[in-house]
């Protein structure tokens, strides 16, 4: 029983578009009648020479799973670096089939946001099922948000992941700020890695002055409002790989910021030299930040009449003289991500 495979020239080969390790590969003994007219396979005595890993996460979401030291079901070759693109079912489960070695590491991500990392302390056993928790707290109302953050802090969690409604707005983000204000005595500055999944926009002032934040991951956000992360002074990393619109001073007032990952920008407000740029005022426009942009990002040109940066049609990374300058700022480096 091997749904991912087909017979071809007397051998089992992967079907087109299928990847080893994403479905069962059960071997049973076949009994063939003397005249060859009937074949009986006893699956009650079939062997599973591999284990099953159930990944529990959000329903109907695409995830990527990266594994080292892993042998997929149906294969005898151990993979040192295997990456899978999976989609969870309606119950939030995704499955892998194979053998994980001692110290095998499994990392689950939703877009660029890490959901969990697990290292096996011993090799998995054949015919045995294992479960990996990559769940995210769903919090749609203000009260649910405050309760979730309070509970995560009480459980000494520093990686807080919330699944918000796509139209989450001022009420929900006020609740996030209030929740961190309420637990301030139990949270050290610059210790929280916050992931917000589902929401499409960070409103103006949405997450400003949150000293608890060390990093923030916004995999679904397409718009970031004015002063959205203003004076998050201990923030070291911002990852918003799908953002296209950013308003004035969205990231201004930082001290520790080192890495920023953005989507393909088409609409950016504010001019760097006037202090209205997205990173606020800097010394001569210099930033000690490594900036990551998608490979298709275009050069942005400032329109003084509209006070807005717009794409020119020229690919940024094809330009011979970009020299790590973007939106009027000089970065430590500007690199492309795919």
Model-flagged regions — what are they?
Residues 30, 130-136, 288-338:
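Extracellular/surface-exposed low-complexity segments
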Residues 1-7, 93-105:
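Short Pro-Gly-centered beta-turn/loop motif in secreted/extracellular proteins
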Residues 175-183, 202-213, 224-234, 246-257, ...:
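Core hydrophobic positions of leucine-rich repeats
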Residues 36-51:
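Beta-strand-rich domain onsets/edges
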Residues 1-40, 110-135:
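Structured interaction patches on ligand/partner-binding surfaces of diverse proteins
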Residues 159-167, 188-201, 211-223, 233-245, ...:
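Structural signature of tandem-repeat unit edges
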Residues 50-68:
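Structural motif
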Residues 72-94:
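Short, acidic Ser/Thr/Gly-rich low-complexity loop/linker segments typical of extracellular
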